[in-house]
Amino acid sequence: MRRRRWTRSSRLALLLGSIALLLTGCSAHDAEKKLRFGWPTGVTKQAEEMRVLWTWTGVTALIVGVFTWGLIFWACIAYRKKGDELPKQTKYNLPLEIFYSIVPFLIITGLFYRTIVVEDDVNKLSKHPDVSIQVDAFKWNWQFEYHSYTDASGTVLQPVYPGQKHVADAAETKGQIGCDEASSNDSYSCGAPGQQGAANGPLYLSTNGSSDEIPVLVLPVHESVRILEHSEDVIHSFWVPEFLFKRDVIPYGTTSTGRDNQFEFTATSTGSFVGHCAELCGTYHSQMNFEVRVVTAEQFQAYLNALAKYPPGDKNYPARQSLALKAAGMSPYATTTHPFNTDRTARSASQNQGS
């Protein structure tokens, strides 16, 4: 009997030692990577919240699975046939039935609650985001209009190019450039797309993509950004894969104020990321790309100031976006994607160049 106990203890110690040895060989980074369970790496605060929900859902499923399979194997071994004697036939076990009815319900309730909490956080709109940007989608490109930027000191920056009066002076805005704050639904009404003026939007702080130049959406890291979406023709969809989030851009003008989807996020990593239209919208849908460039607050402020120096439509500054990016110390052109070829007969760029 003593030898038997010693054998069981030795086996248990060997098992625990093996587990400890395996754990010591895993770094914190490796453990975090394994706990992702295939979840992609995001670059926003909201993406990390979704990752945590996914991780704990997977851990919960593993615990339930291990417990369930453990009971199955235990029953198979402990109650295996040991002779010709017919085992005692049992039925009804009230405590057990209550257990496996209540516990799954509690698990589902907990997961449902956490899902609702994370979903609300992802869709939450703050009263005063650090940056407010209007995104206009059209076949087959994008236009970005910077409506406001509040720096770390709480100052609302309103750069203008020489000879133009502050848009905010004419619009009498409440911390927003060219936008009126609507207290009824905690959103912003910025006028119809394409009709930028003193009261509709900051024309001098907009960038417009074309078949020759990819539009670059420059954003500050670790600051809240609100995106207000407009579509001038059909349904599009704003999607940046690294954000792990997309939202449809509905055609403007379905009501008196238009239907403007909006959302907020906070980027946590600097870098350049390609954005796409994720809703089939016509011939060049697959090439309707843009670039998101997350930079430091200093670079972002420098970019806005530089962009304001070059009036849109000025023949002396045809590539104002490139000039502003270069002035802020960044690559003047997109690095994650390239402009599309409007020649529908060309099969590839190389063939088109060689013809």
What are these regions (language model features)?
Residues 1-7, 76, 316:
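General helical secondary-structure elements
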Residues 2-63:
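Hydrophobic alpha-helical segments
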Residues 65-79:
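Alpha-helical transmembrane segments
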Residues 27-54, 76-355:
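Non-transmembrane, membrane-proximal soluble domains of secreted or membrane proteins
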Residues 58-68, 100, 104:
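Alpha-helical transmembrane segments of integral membrane proteins
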